[in-house]
Each structure stands twice: as structure tokens, then as C-alpha cells.
Amino acid sequence: MPKSKFFRVAVEGGTTDGRTITREWIEQMAKRYNQSTYGARVNMEHIRGIDPEGLFKMYGDITAAKTEEVDMEGEKRLALFVQIDPTPELIELNKARQKVYTSVEIHPNLNEKGAYLMGLAVTDSPASLGRSEE
């Protein structure tokens, strides 16, 4: 299965539910992400099902992460971009315009070495602002 292009999943700053994604977290997640350390998977709505045939199975894997400066509401902000290896089911969901947004799962200090990207959910109601529709 071909990997996706890089797309934006988080931007430093506030979220719709009152949390803050820090610039430091964005930098650390991009720098530290390594599938050999912990392979982050793509799930639906932050639910990890136990049945691989059920609705809440995994929909792919994050293969790489990087940062880029973006302009958001006239301000330069640091953003996290990821590349994924999607399953055929995720591609079909996206074609049907379902679960077109993403929501990052962040551990703020994994193994006491800084923030780490633990997963990515596909959703229709993301908390973080400024993501790409993917």
C-alpha cells in the first residue's frame, strides 16, 4: 500500500476543548518519532477495538513525522505533519467524505524524554485547530 503525502495534524496553540499543544511538544514529537520506538497507529475516534473485523479496528500506521512553520490567522506557528500508510478501509472512508479530520494522541513525556506521538484518530470533530483535511 502506498504511503500518503505528508499532511498537517496539529498546530501549536489552543484547542477547541481548552487544552494547549505547545511548540516544544510539536518539536519533540517530530524529532523523536520512530516506529521502532513505538509505532503509532491510526484509529477511529480514539477507540481501540479488540476485534480486527469490527468498526474500531486500526486504519493504518504513522510512518514519519516532521515540522513546518505555517501561517494561521496571520501568525506564524509550528505545525506537525505526518505521513501514514493507510488501510484500504481508510481510503474508502476518506473517499466517502467520512472521518476526514485527524486528532493527535500525545504522551507529554514518554520515558521521561519528551513528548511522543502515540496515535492518530480519524474523526469528524477534531479538538486541534489548523489541521489539513485528509
Predicted regions and their residues:
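N-terminal, leucine/charged-rich tether regions that mediate assembly and partner docking
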Residues: 1-134
